[in-house]
Amino acid sequence: MTPELLTTLLITGGGLIALAVFFTFVPVGLWISSFAAGVHVSIFTLIGMRLRRVIPSKIVNPLIKAVKAGIELNTNQLESHFLAGGNVDRVVNALIAAHRANIELSFERAAAIDLAGRNVLEAVQMSVNPKVIETPFIAGVAMDGIEVKAKARITVRANIDRLVGGAGEETIIARVGEGVVSTIGSQNNHKHVLENPDMISRTVLTKGLDSGTAFEILSIDIADIDIGKNIGAVLQTDQAEADKKIAQAKAEERRAMAIAREQEMKSSVEEMRAKVVGAEAEVPLAMAEALRNGKLGVMDYVNYLNVQADTEMRKAIGAPVDSESDNE
């Protein structure tokens, strides 16, 4: 192989390697696409994106869509949003959808909403096509004690101006539930609620429940209504059971006091009997003393014994007869 041929091969190989590195590092195809679409992005801008570790296709392709839709944007805006961690493609799609629907939405506002964690494209779509939120069954108790369960469907539209810092769907559902419960609870009879379910939606809708939220409530419709438990009867039953237990406790207390009083009286009776026995034991001593002193004669003593014997006989006659002895 001659030196001239070797040199030619080296130059050709080096050129091919240089071209491969160039086309790998510089997105020439993307630059041609942007130029053909009428979006003027220089090669040096694309190289700068590579150096800043920005994927050029993530910037140029959304920029082409925006320019074709009639929205004026530049690479600096999209690149800064990309470096901030935002979704450039979703923001551009949201701007295009808002532009088509005649909704005023700037790039700065859309980028702020996207960086706040909200889906700005879904918000724009919800502004055009309202969303229906269905609540679970909400239970309220009318003044007559009957539980009424209602299910509501809330039609909401996204409020783009309040997407950042506004409350979400959970707050809307909670506020509507509170309004339904208060409306049912203010009715004297549950039948009035069953006859006029639209009264609930009208009352709740006038409360301004969408304040401070990211949505605008368009309508509240009662989808289903049903009767639950008789809460008043349950409460009365529970109260009666509690009163019964209280009365039983008081009766038991009185019974215990009566038993204690009975035992006290028995003790008093035994004490009195002991005193009587003691007094009876002193009678013979007193009689003996009276006989010694001459204050009691012999005949008086004999009469006393006769009276005592007569008393014992009357007691024996008045005593009940044993049935077993009668049978014998």
Curated annotation (Swiss-Prot):
Any single Pfam family the record assigns to this protein: FloA
Disulfide bond residue pairs: none
TM stretches of this protein: 9-29, 30-50
Location (main, coarse): membrane
One GO cellular component, as annotated: membrane raft
NCBIfam families per record: PRK13665.1
Membrane topology (UniProt): Multi-pass membrane protein
Subcellular location field: Cell membrane; Membrane raft
Purpose: Found in functional membrane microdomains (FMM) that may be equivalent to eukaryotic membrane rafts. FMMs are highly dynamic and increase in number as cells age. Flotillins are thought to be important factors in membrane fluidity.
Classification lineage: Bacteria, Bacillati, Bacillota, Bacilli, Bacillales
Protein name: Flotillin-like protein FloA
Keywords per UniProt: Cell membrane, Membrane, Transmembrane, Transmembrane helix
Oligomeric and partner information: Homooligomerizes.
InterPro entries registered for this protein in UniProt: FloA
Species annotation: Exiguobacterium sp. (strain ATCC BAA-1283 / AT1b)
The organism's place on the tree of life at top rank: Bacteria
Family: Belongs to the flotillin-like FloA family.
